[in-house]
Curated annotation (Swiss-Prot):
One of its GO terms (biological process) is threonyl-tRNA aminoacylation. Homodimer. GO terms for molecular function: ATP binding; metal ion binding; threonine-tRNA ligase activity; tRNA binding. Gene3D superfamilies: 3.10.20.30, 3.30.54.20, Anticodon-binding domain, Bira Bifunctional Protein, Domain 2, Threonyl-trna Synthetase, Chain A, domain 2. Its cofactor is Zn(2+). It comes from the Bacteria. This is Threonine--tRNA ligase. Residues 242-533 are annotated as: Catalytic. Catalyzes the attachment of threonine to tRNA(Thr) in a two-step reaction: L-threonine is first activated by ATP to form Thr-AMP and then transferred to the acceptor end of tRNA(Thr). Also edits incorrectly charged L-seryl-tRNA(Thr). NCBIfam families: thrS. Coiled coil: none annotated.
């Protein structure tokens, strides 16, 4: 007899072998019908997999996150089933789960059209309605190769070639369609009803632009119809907030083919940039940072010495002059070490906090570029703290407090923290990495925050704390980082004089709050749907006259607002006021000021905030209200 321990601690006995599906059926018909898969001794398994020893078993249903991901993975296989029925010559490649969805890469003779995707979705619904079982068969490797050879699935054969040698592999049969996978998958297509194919894109085989282009069909799947509906509404809202669309509508920036991944900032967009940069500069000055500026281009030998050439050269732009080879900087950190090294440093100088709005360039693949979110030329709100080991925790706490306060000022109150640990490709010994990772854990503990850990996600020179903000649509964006580095000071020979008159290496803390300013502006545009809070808006007020009689008073109002520090524009066009209000509304200015004869006579302004009419206000009182609104946002938040 087998002893099966369930999550509530109860133990049930079964004849050996037993499956998760059989265990669920013995508990109740409702649970049996809802069973997607199981977790046996911590490992996810198919509902049909035999259990042959005493085990701890959890039954996975669509209510579990793992259940949702299994449904999504099975939907990807269903895409394959539908595609092969409609387009028999198509070659299936890979179909993984991604956040909130899945995709399948497919090789076709000609690109799919939106009409093709609609036909594939319709066929998937027809297949789901057949309510067929998904059958798993553990198949000898040689037989699996034969199956795919007979079906002409060349990409599956290439994938098998790359896999470790195994005696048997999981083959999942959707009627006549078969696909290979580690699994688990749903036992029946009834679990796949709440899905939607969302978009079509191109993707290179193995992500290499030198390889052939494939067709990528994206989709999503959920446990319930309501969850699917809510997701679709969220995606539709995200499309309305797309920073590329709003960037054009609000006249903030544009991109063009002649400068891929480089941004052309328009006056309003550059005004927004300057508001952010000046605000960050003020916060950094108050926190004890000294601003510096380092060269854009440095000799290749410098990057070899820092370790960037060995670990990062594929992402670096290079050039040559007078028989010397140079690289455009992808990061600011080595330059800051040079400033630290320029002069004899004492323990009394530590911590030394050097900040730079540093312009960097990285040779990102063209297919990965995406508006402001993924660019080749960008500016980081970068800073490096040179300190002793004893100062790590206090500096981390101060940084954490600064970061959280700034995020709140920008409207982000939900912040999660991750600790990224050593990657496979890295500089420095394991002892150094042990020390660095433990140092960041101690710092996080001192900050009193909860965190998750991400093995293999650290930078090549050190582990890092990642700060993720959640936006108005519930999406998570990684922005801030704090990285602990013992390696770069060693490689670039940074040192200071200790209290005992000895020489020692400083610890280097790499830190950013916004990350790339370009990307952060993209996030802000989408989070606020282009309707920026008053303190942040590139144009805070637009002042409009009803007739020419009020033009001079409008100029006086604008001058008074500008003298009080506000970014105000005039609209004195000879147009009807209704038209001017509608026309200016598309730019989503926080306030619209309308001036008629009555306002001019009484030294007042008629105020509109978005679509709300606030009535006629005394100008001085209105300025005081604006000042209080900004104080509340930046100080009281």
């Amino acid at each position: 007899m087998l002893n099966i321990t369930l999550p509530d601690g109860s133990v049930r006995q079964y004849e050996s072998p037993v499956t998760v599906a059989q265990i669920a059926a013995s508990i109740g018909a409702g649970l049996a019908k809802a069973t997607v898969a199981g977790r046996v001794n911590g490992k996810l398994v198919d509902a049909c997999d035999p259990i042959v020893e005493d085990s701890a078993v959890q039954i996975i249903t669509p209510k579990d996150q793992e259940g949702i991901e299994i449904i999504r993975h099975s939907c990807a296989h269903l895409v394959g089933h539908a595609v092969k029925q409609l387009y028999p010559n198509a070659k299936m490649v890979i179909g993984p789960v991604i956040e909130e969805g899945f995709y399948y890469d497919i090789a076709t003779e000609k690109p799919f059209t939106p009409e093709d995707v609609a036909a594939i979705e319709a066929r998937m619904k027809e297949l789901i309605a057949q309510d067929y079982d998904v059958v798993k068969i553990m198949t000898p490797r040689a037989e699996a190769i034969k199956i795919f050879q007979e079906r002409g699935e060349e990409y599956k054969l290439r994938l098998i070639d790359d896999m470790p040698e195994v005696e048997a592999m999981g083959m999942y049969h959707h009627q006549e369609y078969v696909d290979m996978c580690r699994g688990p998958h749903v036992p029946n297509t009834r679990f796949l009803k709440n899905f939607k194919l969302t978009k079509l894109a191109g993707a290179y085989w193995r992500g290499d632009s030198n390889n052939e282009m494939l067709q990528r069909i994206y989709g999503t799947a959920w446990a319930t119809k309501d969850e699917l509906k809510a997701y679709i509404q969220r995606i539709e809202e995200a499309e309305k907030r797309d920073h590329r669309k709003l960037g054009k509508q609000l006249d903030l920036f544009h991109l063009q083919d002649e400068a891929p991944g480089m941004v052309f900032w328009h006056p309003k967009g550059w005004a927004l940039w300057q508001v952010i940069e000046q605000h960050m500069r003020k916060e950094l000055n108050a926190a004890g940072y000294k601003e510096v500026k380092t060269p854009q281009i440095m000799d290749k030998t410098f990057w070899e010495k820092s370790g960037h050439w060995d670990n990062y050269k594929d992402n670096m732009f290079v050039t040559s002059s007078e028989k010397r080879e140079y690289a455009v900087k992808p990061m600011n950190c080595p330059g800051h070490v040079q400033i630290f090294n320029n002069g004899l440093r004492s323990y009394r100088d530590l911590p030394m906090r050097l900040a730079e709005f540093g312009s960097c360039h990285r040779n990102e693949p063209s297919g990965a570029l995406h508006g402001l979110m993924r660019v080749r030329g960008f500016v980081q709100d970068d800073a490096h703290i040179f300190c002793t080991e004893d100062q790590i925790v206090s500096e981390a706490r101060a940084f954490n407090e600064l970061l959280i306060r700034i995020y709140k000022q920008f409207g982000f109150h939900d912040v999660s923290v991750k600790l990224s640990l050593r990657p496979e490709k890295r500089a420095g010994s394991d002892d150094v990495w042990d020390k660095a990772e433990q140092g960041l854990r101690e710092a996080l503990t001192a900050c009193g925050v909860e965190w998750g850990e991400l093995p293999g996600e650290g930078a090549f020179y050190g582990p890092k704390i990642e700060y993720h903000v959640r936006d108005a649509l519930g999406r998570s964006w990684q922005c801030g980082t704090l990285q602990l580095d013992f390696v770069l000071p060693e490689r670039l020979n940074a040192e200071y004089v200790t209290e005992n008159n000895d020489r020692a290496r400083p610890v280097m803390l790499h830190r950013a709050i916004l990350g790339s300013l370009e990307r952060f502006i993209g996030i802000l545009i989408e989070n606020h749907a282009g309707s920026f809070p008053l303190w942040l808006a590139p144009v805070q007020l637009v002042i409009m006259n009803i007739t020419e009689n009020q033009a001079d008073y409008c100029r006086e109002v604008a001058a008074k607002l500008q003298a009080a520090g506000f970014r105000a524009e005039l609209d004195l066009r000879n147009e009807k006021i209704g038209y001017k209000i509608r026309d200016n509304s598309q730019y989503r200015f926080p306030y619209q000021i309308v001036v008629g004869d009555k306002e001019k006579q009484e030294n007042k302004v008629a105020v509109r905030r978005k679509a709300e009419d606030l009535g006629s206000l005394d100008l001085d009182d209105f300025i005081a209200q604006l000042q209080q609104e900004i104080t509340d946002a930046l100080v009281n938040h």
